[in-house]
Amino acid sequence: MKKAATPVKKHKALGDWRGEMLARVRKIIKEAAPGVVEEVKWRKPSNAMRGVPVWSHAGIICTGETYKSVVKLTCAKGASLDDPSRLFNSSLEGNTRRAIDIHEGEKIDEKALKALIRGAVALNTSKRIRP
């Protein structure tokens, strides 16, 4: 049986910095949350049928989208997460989500991103536990 491609494989086929960045983000997420579930959702013509990589653990942690000039990492419950390093720089006005827009040439603060991912896992897990 052929092994299923990772969600990022199709995005790496972009052949540019966006695919490389998404692969880097994926590696950081997997290091921060080794039990994370990866899926591709929302395939449609507007994203060349690549879909959107989604990382979950007891609920969606974040999604990774590629646009023409940005890789967007959206945390489903980002508004509820502590962000002392101020990684969130997009979708700041809402009550639920927060996003990190990464432009070509920008570096990722791995330590801060891992802390956000671990915080998202803890939040998702705590919401599942009922007294």
PLM segments and residue spans:
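Charge-dense, helix-prone N-terminal extensions
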Residues: 1-131
